[in-house]
Amino acid sequence: MNISTQASSRKGAQSCVIALHCSLGSGRQWTKLAAELGPGARLIAPDLIGYGNSACTFDLPMTLAQEVACLRGTLDEAGGPIHLVGHSYGGAIAFRIATDPAYEHRIRSLTLIEPVLPTLLRESGPDRRLHDRFAELAAELRQDIQGGAVLEAIDKFTEFWCGSGPREELPPAARIRMIERAERLTFDFASAFAEENVTVAAASLRIPVLLFSGGQSPNLTQRIVRRLAAVMDGADMRHLPDAGHMLAMTHAAIINPVISAHIARADELAGAPLATGQRNADLVSLADG
């Protein structure tokens, strides 16, 4: 599902927010963010290829660069400057767009919510074990899915992303949707593990960057966020101790105002009309909501 352009009377004057969802999700993930940005904002939340109502002339992508190619129409639709927001696998794609020479000049800000960029951890000895365990999980899921053990694969996938948080039973409808899209997971993992030189690319960014992590998330993504914050000049990192990996949805009431303010500040720095509903709050601590 696409959350298409929100009503705007200033054609060509505003930047556009492009929000990318997590694995096994859809663009509907961002309905609360659209509401937070307000009726004066432009937001596009596409379904990634293989999810929801997406369409692409390519086969399922095996690299993040191919994911970006599938989003070319969306990026063209945005027209001008872009604010990227991405969660989990969508965060990895957002990062790839922001560091792509074809698009980097159009990116005005970047918000990453626990992006899945595991090769970043391969570059560090102490973090290598997190990378290797995630690679083992990817191999197990691929074997399960290819062998027809889809339910087992979904259970392993959801258990991993629960991190240290409570295990909650998935609603039947959500479980069915995940089963229907399970094959896509193997491509998501392949694309994430194919991305190289993440540290160098991250250090090259010269735009406002906002990073989120949750204290109950897997150590993998918590460490990825910390590593990115360490190499991205001036990155604003926010840690929510009581949040899990799905904080983009479970803690939307906390993080969406921060994202909105981040986007507004980036537009102000660029001397452009605000892409959001004129919010300019300086939110500092998210520890307890």
Name these PLM-found stretches.
Residues 234-289:
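Catalytic active-site module of serine/aspartate enzymes centered on a nucleophile-bearing elbow/loop
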Residues 174-230, 239:
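Conserved serine/cysteine hydrolase catalytic core
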Residues 146-186:
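Conserved alpha/beta-hydrolase catalytic His-Asp/Glu region
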Residues 30-31, 54-60, 121-124, 222-223:
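Conserved catalytic-core motifs of eukaryotic protein kinase domains, centered on the activation segment
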Residues 99-100, 104-144:
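Flexible "cap/lid" loop of the alpha/beta hydrolase fold
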Residues 35, 44-85, 89, 96-100, ...:
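Active-site loop/oxyanion-hole signature of alpha/beta-hydrolase fold enzymes
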Residues 6-56, 80:
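Conserved HGGG/HGGXW glycine-rich cap/lid loop of the alpha/beta-hydrolase fold
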Residues 20-22, 88, 214:
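Glycine-rich His-Gly loop
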